[in-house]
């Protein structure tokens, strides 16, 4: 059997992830069946699951990519910066509109819940660290505990995703983010 190059494997993996992102965005997590994933990706289930153990692993790979990117932005610009990136390029985050399905699955599937918690920890850590640095620099309110501020920003993120998914005007949402940012800044 001919040896497949690392570049070829990486390109196939990228094709799988890009197709899966589109499929999850269009159908949501639960309705993104293996057949729909095959159609969106343009590969057989054997080819897809050669690279990813199962649908959860594929979904978590997307979550890992986005979490790493979001954590890097959150470290530099805070969670508000992440949300501004989402408004600037909503098509890059449209699959995250599945968060309502994810919330239900988190309550009912312990394995999924553990996997999701692992993927979310990096973004939470970056946000917490950014808030700590901003408090030390006297830029963020000190009358509210950091964990409460992070929870507040997480709630705003969830709402932003829901509004983007329902077609809300990104400019209006940007104005809301200005309000949120001012609410956490030190006066």
Curated annotation (Swiss-Prot):
DNA-binding region as annotated in the record: 33-52
Origin superkingdom: Bacteria
An example Gene Ontology molecular-function term: transcription cis-regulatory region binding
Gene Ontology cellular component terms for the protein in this record: peptidoglycan-based cell wall
InterPro entries reported for this sequence: Homeodomain-like_sf, HTH-type_TetR-like_transc_reg, HTH_TetR, Tet_transcr_reg_TetR-rel_C_sf
Transmembrane spans: none
Subunit structure: Homodimer.
Record protein name field: HTH-type transcriptional repressor Rv1474c
């Amino acid at each position: 059997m001919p040896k497949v190059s690392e570049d070829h494997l990486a390109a196939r993996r990228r094709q799988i992830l890009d197709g899966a992102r589109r499929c999850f965005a269009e159908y949501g997590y639960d309705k993104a069946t293996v057949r729909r994933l095959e159609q969106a990706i343009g590969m057989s289930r054997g080819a897809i699951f050669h690279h990813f153990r199962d649908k959860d692993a594929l979904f978590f790979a997307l979550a890992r990519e986005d979490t790493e990117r979001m954590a890097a932005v959150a470290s530099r610009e805070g969670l508000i910066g992440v949300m501004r990136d989402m408004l600037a390029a909503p098509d890059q985050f449209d699959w995250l509109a599945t968060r309502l399905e994810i919330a239900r699955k988190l309550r009912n599937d312990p394995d999924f819940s553990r996997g999701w918690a692992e993927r979310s920890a990096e973004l939470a850590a970056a946000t917490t660290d950014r808030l700590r640095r901003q408090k030390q620099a006297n830029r963020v309110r000190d009358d509210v505990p950091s964990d409460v501020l992070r929870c507040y920003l997480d709630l705003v993120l969830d709402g932003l995703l829901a509004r983007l998914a329902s077609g809300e005007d990104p400019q209006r949402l940007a104005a809301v983010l200005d309000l949120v940012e001012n609410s956490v800044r030190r006066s």
